[in-house]
From Swiss-Prot:
One of its GO terms (cellular component) is cytosol. The keyword Transferase applies. It comes from Prochlorococcus marinus (strain MIT 9215). (2S)-2-hydroxy-3-oxobutyl phosphate binds at E90, T91, R132. Pathway: Cofactor biosynthesis; riboflavin biosynthesis; riboflavin from 2-hydroxy-3-oxobutyl phosphate and 5-amino-6-(D-ribitylamino)uracil: step 1/2. This is 6,7-dimethyl-8-ribityllumazine synthase. Belongs to the DMRL synthase family. The lineage of its organism: Bacteria, Bacillati, Cyanobacteriota, Cyanophyceae, Synechococcales. One of its GO terms (biological process) is riboflavin biosynthetic process.
Length: 158
């Protein structure tokens, strides 16, 4: 029996793309910071001159799939992280954005055979989003760990 797993020890060889929504940037900037901190601590070069990590800003979470798709056509990535924050309001807009963003990201990932980490916070309140972006825990760190694990796993499988 062969067991394949992702590794956290050889992360420094990964090429990572990040697509991030500007809407709710009070939250998304914090998530990005946590994400970059984790990548750096695992050996990736996150400096502005880095060829290892690319960041693309989009208006909102609805635009994440097309940006991820276009980014992957431009360069080869081991993994892409899609970051956003959608906070429930009084209309059905929340449900539409989350549904389409998640479906689109999954479709782009499968079409390109590249893992895309779904790092879009979906919360009922701003307070919940703030808690997940750093007051209690920064989920950006978790999304980066998922990216490292999946990126290395797919490299091992190929």
């Amino acid at each position: 029996m062969t067991i394949f797993e992702g590794s956290f020890t050889n992360a420094s060889t990964l090429k990572v793309g990040i697509v991030i929504a500007r809407f709710n940037d009070l939250i998304t900037n914090k998530i990005l910071s946590g994400c970059l901190d984790c990548l750096k601590k695992h050996g990736l070069d996150t400096s502005e001159l880095s060829n290892q990590v690319d960041i693309v800003w989009v208006p909102g979470s609805f635009e994440l799939p097309i940006a991820a798709k276009t980014l992957m056509k431009k360069k080869s990535y081991d993994v892409v992280i899609a970051l956003g924050a959608v906070i429930r309001g009084e209309t059905s807009h929340y449900d539409v954005v989350i549904s389409e963003a998640s479906k689109g990201i999954s479709q782009v990932s499968n079409e390109n055979n590249v893992p895309i980490i779904f790092g879009v916070l979906t919360t009922d309140t701003l307070q919940q989003a703030l808690e997940r972006a750093g007051i209690k825990n920064n989920l950006g760190w978790n999304y980066a760990l998922q990216a490292i694990e999946m990126g290395s796993l797919i490299k091992n499988l190929n």
